[in-house]
């Protein structure tokens, strides 16, 4: 039968992509249905209990700037917050939070259930209604037909999901959940390129069986970072520490002796796994020269003893998993609560998508998340928001939208997927963005919130907070520009004494702030009250200090564009080029591109790598000229 109500947008799947997609469409005012096989797993963190990290936090902040849920839920569920790369420049700093699974999921559920224009229905989707190459709706497991203008598929690892523990395997979307077999079969009938990918998860450990005195404590940062632009430290639950230990020679011996029982190394698994989150057996095999690998014990929550041992993802048989765990310092008596496993699943070549994440061959059908070959909650959430927004725009009869590479990491993510595709699970890094001095996590709202408001994604409260911040930045910049310090005055002498060099001439405070040895806090301590809002103060300081670098980067980008047709020698040995990662050396060696332009379009070859190639070619050319002149 047909469901009595028609919807504008239907979202299939209630993970990180699906929840952001459904919330985005509903915020834009269209009637939205979220179909999930289990209401209790909405927003579930299927793998590690953490949000953010290098490159990933930039996506979280962009989701937040566009009114999304991930950062808000993280502030409500985060039990440890840290800033990674804190000693480096703001462009590569990244906020990372350990999250309480229960609190995070509850925060997402609350947002979903209180979102106007959004309906939730528990039922697995088995089929799509497609007529004349246009999607018309969805058929559920019990034959119920839901009709809609746009459908967003966010199926995660559920399409044809196959779970592996040792040489045994069984169908599953994740541990404890059934796979989507009928829907996977239906999608394979469509004229879309399909492949198999793999991911994995480690065994979970009972913290009561762990000797933490044998490990290194890793507390969170003080003062506590905040994830959302609207967040506050008062929202955070009690904070906890993580713990660090290491694998050892005995661990590696156990793994090496049992590789023949690994589904990965015995040929049972066909799918390609994530390069930057390898299993422990893959680490031992690929990095045989390393004596040990770090293991981070991450708490799963405040009301459970379960720990997530980040660094030992495995699909080896359970008896081997137990040996591995108990060979590690501090875990000699550890009890495994849940075994680790690998999961294979279908994904579709993202080159068959438009920039809106709508499929090229079926109008109104959008894909987001792991179905597009990505890995990670943050990558999924960002795609979900974009797909949900474009599904709503289509239902409204409006043009689609996607940020450019110079506007957002989301733009980098989509451009990489759409133009290059991926043969392995795609993870975001800051190195993938050639405009990363502009695309900082601290200015995501300044880059995107105005567009979000225009699209209908940003509510009144967020818009008011954003406008106040933007006006505060302009006001403080103007104040600093109009405030002057002269040599020989009390202020001038105080600045000279603090920084060890007298003022040579009259400066305004904005000019002084641009100097590397002067920070905003020190400046206002010497010159009088400044901006009380820390976000405004941070933005004024970063904008002022980065101004020259940003201009220089724009020039570099223009030069890179001009170097499109620079030839690469056929005999170039990429392994000898300093600074290139092993991944990029391998890919360039396999593809043997003829020009820098071709090299730049190889999946995984970053703009930074192209710059290194250009520098190497210049050095090589200069060396050859010297030889000839000699």
Curated annotation (Swiss-Prot):
Cofactor(s) demanded: FAD
This protein's UniProt keywords: Cytoplasm, FAD, Flavoprotein, NAD, tRNA processing
Compartments it resides in: Cytoplasm
Chief subcellular location: cytoplasm
Binding site for FAD: 13-18
Transmembrane segments: none
GO molecular-function terms, A-Z: flavin adenine dinucleotide binding
GO BP field: tRNA methylation; tRNA wobble uridine modification
One Pfam family here: GIDA
GO annotations of cellular component type: cytosol
Binding site for NAD(+): 273-287
Database matches in InterPro entries: FAD/NAD-bd_sf (IPR036188), GIDA_C_N (IPR049312), MnmG (IPR004416), MnmG-rel (IPR002218), MnmG-rel_CS (IPR020595), MnmG_C (IPR026904), MnmG_C_subdom (IPR047001), MnmG_C_subdom_sf (IPR044920)
Domain of life per record: Bacteria
Role description: NAD-binding protein involved in the addition of a carboxymethylaminomethyl (cmnm) group at the wobble position (U34) of certain tRNAs, forming tRNA-cmnm(5)s(2)U34.
Family membership noted in the UniProt record: Belongs to the MnmG family.
Assembly: Homodimer. Heterotetramer of two MnmE and two MnmG subunits.
PANTHER family listed in its UniProt record: GLUCOSE INHIBITED DIVISION PROTEIN A, PROTEIN MTO1 HOMOLOG, MITOCHONDRIAL
Protein name (Swiss-Prot/TrEMBL): tRNA uridine 5-carboxymethylaminomethyl modification enzyme MnmG
Organism: Stutzerimonas stutzeri (strain A1501)
Gene label: mnmG
């Amino acid at each position: 039968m047909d469901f009595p109500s028609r919807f504008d947008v239907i979202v299939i799947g209630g993970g990180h992509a699906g929840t952001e997609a459904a919330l985005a469409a509903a915020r834009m005012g269209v009637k939205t249905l979220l179909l999930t096989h289990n209401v209790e797993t909405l927003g579930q963190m299927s793998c590690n209990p953490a949000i953010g990290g290098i490159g990933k936090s930039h996506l979280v902040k962009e989701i937040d700037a566009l009114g999304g849920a991930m950062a808000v839920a993280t502030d409500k569920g985060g039990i440890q917050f840290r800033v990674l790369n804190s000693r480096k420049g703001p462009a590569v700093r990244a906020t990372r939070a350990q999250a309480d699974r229960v609190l995070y999921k509850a925060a997402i559920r609350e947002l979903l259930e209180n979102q106007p224009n959004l309906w939730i229905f528990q039922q697995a989707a088995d089929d799509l209604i497609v007529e004349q190459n246009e999607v018309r709706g969805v058929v559920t497991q019990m034959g119920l037909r839901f009709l809609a203008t746009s459908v967003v598929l966010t199926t995660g690892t559920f399409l044809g999901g196959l779970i592996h523990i040792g040489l045994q395997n069984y169908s599953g979307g994740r541990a404890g959940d059934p796979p989507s077999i009928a829907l996977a079969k239906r999608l394979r009938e469509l004229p879309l390129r399909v492949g198999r990918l793999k991911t994995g998860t480690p065994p979970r450990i009972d913290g009561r069986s762990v000797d933490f005195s044998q490990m290194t404590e890793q507390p969170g940062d003080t003062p506590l970072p905040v994830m959302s632009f609207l967040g506050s430290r008062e929202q955070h639950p009690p904070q906890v520490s993580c713990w660090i230990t290491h694998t050892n020679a005995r661990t590696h011996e156990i793994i090496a002796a049992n590789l023949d029982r690994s589904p990965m190394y015995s040929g049972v698994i066909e799918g390609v796994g994530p390069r930057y989150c390898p299993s422990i057996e893959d680490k031992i095999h690929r990095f045989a020269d390393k004596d040990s690998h770090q293991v981070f014990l991450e708490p799963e929550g405040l009301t459970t003893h379960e720990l997530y041992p980040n660094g030992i993802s495995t699909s080896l048989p359970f008896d081997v998993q137990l040996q591995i765990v108990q060979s590690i310092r501090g875990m000699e008596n550890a009890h495994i609560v849940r075994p680790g496993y690998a999961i294979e699943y279908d994904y579709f070549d993202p080159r068959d998508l438009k920039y809106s994440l709508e499929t090229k061959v079926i109008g109104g059908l959008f894909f987001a998340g792991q179905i597009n070959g990505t890995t990670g909650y943050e990558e999924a959430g960002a795609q979900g928001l974009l797909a949900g927004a474009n599904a709503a725009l289509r239902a409204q009869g409006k043009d689609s939208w996607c940020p450019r590479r110079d506007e957002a990491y989301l733009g980098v993510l989509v451009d990489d997927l759409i133009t290059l595709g991926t043969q392995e699970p795609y993870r975001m890094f800051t190195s993938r963005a050639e405009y990363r001095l502009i695309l900082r996590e601290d200015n995501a709202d300044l880059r995107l919130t105005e567009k979000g408001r225009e699209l209908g994604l940003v509510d009144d409260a967020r818009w008011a907070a954003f406008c106040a911040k933007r006006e505060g930045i302009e006001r403080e910049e103007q104040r600093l520009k109009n405030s002057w310090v002269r040599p020989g005055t009390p202020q001038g002498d105080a600045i000279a004494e603090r920084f060890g060099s007298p003022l040579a001439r009259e400066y305004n405070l904005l000019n002084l702030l641009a100097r590397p040895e002067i920070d905003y806090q020190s400046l206002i301590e010497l010159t009088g009250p400044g901006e009380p809002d820390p976000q405004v103060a941070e933005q004024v300081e970063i904008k002022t200090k980065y101004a020259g670098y940003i201009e220089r980067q724009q020039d570099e980008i223009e030069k890179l564009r001009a170097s499109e047709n620079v030839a690469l020698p056929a005999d170039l040995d990429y392994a000898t080029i300093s600074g290139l990662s092993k991944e990029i050396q391998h890919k360039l060696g396999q593809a043997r591109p003829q020009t820098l332009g071709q090299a730049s379009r190889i999946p995984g070859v970053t703009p930074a790598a192209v710059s290194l190639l250009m520098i190497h070619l210049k050095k090589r050319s200069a060396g050859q000229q010297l030889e000839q002149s000699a």
